[in-house]
């Protein structure tokens, strides 16, 4: 698939949220009637080309929900949300991770996956890899296996892929 359709709908916004940062805005991609469908199709093709066959999709709050559900629908699979703390009503696993300034946490229900599940992690952006690594750690607490991670965008100069060494990582658009 030609990824120009996707790349052309990601807008570079200089100096947001602070000077020196170039924010990659996906809202035009989502606003396009074909944007989400084409992104899910491109993700599905990437998985097929690598021989990755998940049994379930996990998406990280919040934009991972958007792309994760679209991909799950395209593949005929279920979807599990990976949430910020305090959003899930039943017993959870929790993993904390470091941000540039401070820390954050993610949670999933303890029974979100079966030990036989082959989980694909979906999110919009791979930057430093902290959120993705925490997501992998959460899934591994359930005894399920992570078969890959896929992102719409990868910011290569932030080396997030290095943090995920040993995992199958894909990104549709790289900057």
Region annotations inferred by a language model:
Residues 80-120:
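Short, glycine/charge-rich flexible loops or terminal/linker lids adjacent to PRPP-binding catalytic cores
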Residues 1-53:
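Active-site-facing substrate-recognition patch
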Residues 74, 96-100, 164-168:
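Short, hinge-like loop/turn segments at secondary-structure boundaries
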Residues 52-61:
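Short glycine-rich phosphate-binding loop at a beta-alpha junction
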Residues 55, 117, 147:
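Conserved acidic residues
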Residues 2, 8, 134-175:
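PRPP-dependent phosphoribosyltransferase catalytic core
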Residues 66-75, 136:
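Short Gly/Thr/Asp-enriched flexible loops that form oxyanion-binding sites at enzyme active sites
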Residues 124, 129:
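Conserved G/P- and acidic residue-centered "switch" motifs that form tight phosphate/ATP-binding loops
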């Amino acid at each position: 698939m030609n990824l120009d359709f996707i790349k052309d709908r990601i807008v570079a916004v200089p100096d947001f949220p602070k000077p020196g940062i170039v924010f990659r805005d996906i809202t035009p991609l989502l606003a396009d009637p074909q944007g989400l469908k084409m992104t899910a199709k491109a993700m599905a093709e990437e998985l097929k080309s690598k021989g990755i066959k998940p049994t379930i999709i996990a998406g990280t709050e919040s934009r991972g929900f958007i792309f994760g559900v679209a991909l799950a629908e395209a593949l005929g699979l279920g979807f599990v949300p990976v949430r910020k703390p305090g959003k899930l009503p039943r017993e959870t696993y929790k993993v904390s991770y470091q941000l540039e300034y401070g820390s954050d946490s993610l949670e999933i229900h303890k029974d979100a996956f079966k030990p036989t599940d082959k989980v694909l992690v979906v999110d919009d952006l791979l930057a430093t890899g902290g959120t993705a690594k925490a997501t992998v750690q959460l899934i591994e607490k359930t005894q399920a296996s992570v078969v890959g991670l896929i992102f719409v965008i990868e910011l290569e100069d932030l080396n997030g892929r290095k943090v995920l060494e040993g995992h199958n990582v894909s990104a549709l658009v790289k900057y």
